[in-house]
Amino acid sequence: MKSKRLIGLLLHTALPVWAFSQIKGTIVDIHQQPVEGATIVMQLPDSTYLEATISAADGTFMLKPEPESYQLIVQHLLYQTRQIKGRAHDVGIITLEPKDYNLEEVVIKGERPLVKVEDGRLGYDLSVLSEKRAVNNAYEAISKLPGVQESNGTLSLAGASSLTIVMNGKPTTMTADQLETLLRNTPVDRVEKAEVIYSAPPELHVRGAVINVVMKRSNDYSFQGELSTYYQNRYFSSGGANGNLRLSTPKVTLDVMYGADNAKIMEYTDLFSRHTLGDKVYEITQNEKLSTKSWMHNVRTALEYNINEKNRLNIAYTGSFTPDRNGRSIADGSFQQSTLDKFTENKMHNIAVQYSSGFGLELGGDYTRFTSDNNQTMLTQLTDNSENAYTLTGGQRIDRYSVYADQKHSLPNNWGIGYGVSYLYTKNYDFQTYNNVTGNIKPENTDAKLEEQTTNFYFSLSKNWATGTSFTVSATGEYYTIGNYHKWAVYPQASLTYLKSPQHIFQLSLSTDKTYPGYWDMQSSVTYLNGYSEIQGTPGLRPMTNYNLNGNYILKQKYIVGLFYKHTSDYFAQSPYQATDRLALIYKNTNWNYMRMIGANIIVPFSMGNWYDARLTLVGMQARQKCDQFFDIPFDRKKWIFVGTLDNTFKVGKNLSFELTGNVQTPFIQGTLDLASTFNLTAGMKWNFAKDKCTFTARCSDIFNSSMPDMKVRFKGQYLDMNSSFYTRTVSLNFTYRFGGYWWLAHFSRFCHLQIIDIQQYYEAMYRDTNP
């Protein structure tokens, strides 16, 4: 025992000794009233305990040690715990958020804010938003954020012309689909928060609206894991399994993930075309059935290494493999009967490296390799007994390299500046070769190589006031080249957050952006879908330029009212066109003059007791779409659209909850297309059991098969009807098992008051762990 005491004494005396200066601050609630009796624990960044104290009646506190950098843990029975990192001797005002607490017969009620605003970012705790909802991964939780809507696998944000997802505030060379796959395999409890940003700051190296998914960092000794499996029925039955492991110490955190999915999809489309060719009108009916089956394997390994308390290194590998994707399209109608078989193999590898320093410098690099090989066979029999047929061998090779460097400086009086540079190089190779071609079709072989380079450099200026008001302005210069196309551009960005009080927050943001077309869209190629429909490439397709102005008013950190204006020059979209020289339905991306949208949105959460929570989201806007060069039928169209979503959550007991979500959208337009109204009703349940180690969820999405709009064209002689609202109802079951936990030594009582641990016991325990 004496030797253990001596070891504890030696270790204790080996701790750094600081001058007798003091760390001070003030604890207040959301009404700026002092909080008495809050426990403040001071630690080093590696979680080494230093000292603890209690806030006084006026909310003030003082701590004697003053290390170069530290973290404070602030706790109180009636408020949510906060963790703050600092370097200054005066940490200023620390605001605590209230929480609900059930203490035997006494119920102390507090209301958790829906959103927290910091530096112009709307921060949401995903674990809180999804704790009662039937969500099974980070992607599904993001789709439940206020103002966010998912449609056909694409996320959109009310008031934004486009939406980009990033992880940990840094860019990636993975595509949106590849990032979605990663998030669908990421547990919700690995995410610290999601930040909604209407005007992304330049250090994110993306522009426009962004959702930044911030992953949790661990400074404790722990081993945690999660195993899950799911079943899904959407005409076909599908399923999969996923495993996640995390091993963490104050120095190193290792994450490993593997998932396997057996996906089977059925799509069905009814088409009626009244096709005018010369002086004759042909009525063409067609039913198309597309089935796809595949296995997908996803793997990710991420290592975070804390070099010291100031420097951190992150390395991650992500892989996605689809070795045997088989698809068959069968079209049967009055004009033709066709069968198209397609076999595809896809592989994706991504490596990302990030380094963060203690003096504001961040460096990073990212590489993605994507390969796709496909073989197609098509046979078409026309009503005049002629045949069209071909076999095709094609593929795509993409290499993307990205590097960036960012630097921030803190100036006196809470001013700040930032500057940085990024470079993206992409090499793309597309090819397709037709063989055994017969009939009245003239396919062209394609062998195209494209090199794309994007260089960005930026400068930003920011200011924060003690009241919480802040603003940031920046300008990003960009030099972009693809093939023989070269373009210089400047993108301004600005955001202002005015905090009259925590109950009244105003936001204003301006952003500009460019969206570039896909590589395949710019090829002079034709892809035959069947004997009537085809997709044409568009050489010379120009990028679209987006201008966005957003304003938000946030009341009581819950209710959000927003106004927005969006103008997009050279907007491009794919719209159908009935050819005038032959019986063919052409799908082709074309540049419009512009698309303009102006509107408003409102988000209203409400609840009744502890058993019912709901959120109402309403969006109304007018769109104007103009194109002078859409084949031979230019258009200039306007349309009002309204979207309403009501999320309902019913809590039955502590561990069981049900949800019911309804979404309705009024008719809309896309070029010459008229889109009918849609309605989506989804029901689900969530059951936690085995001391919250197990979770079972069940959900039925799109109960009435009405989430896909009927489409029609009635414009300048074009007459077309398309109905794809088949087989969209989806039933899914998910089971998740969580295991592991913390090996840490600090203990807190059930009432969140610190239990003082003798320093000898602390080091004795550490000695036992390291010397078994």
Summary of predicted features, one role per range:
Residues 139-174:
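Extracytoplasmic beta-strand/coil segments of soluble accessory domains associated
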Residues 92-95, 138-141, 179-181, 195-196, ...:
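N-terminal periplasmic accessory domains that precede
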Residues 41-43, 75-79, 91-130, 150-152, ...:
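Short, acidic, small-residue-rich periplasmic hinge/interaction motif at the N-terminus
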Residues 43-48, 71-85:
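A short, solvent-exposed loop/turn motif at the edges and junctions
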Residues 45-60:
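Short, acidic Ser/Thr/Gly-rich low-complexity loop/linker segments typical of extracellular
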Residues 172-199:
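Short acidic/polar hinge/loop motifs at secondary-structure boundaries
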Residues 252, 296-322, 341-492, 497-503, ...:
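Face-selective signature of the C-terminal outer-membrane beta-barrel domain
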Residues 514-563, 567-569, 585-599, 604-607, ...:
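Outer-membrane beta-barrel signature, preferentially recognizing the C-terminal barrel domain
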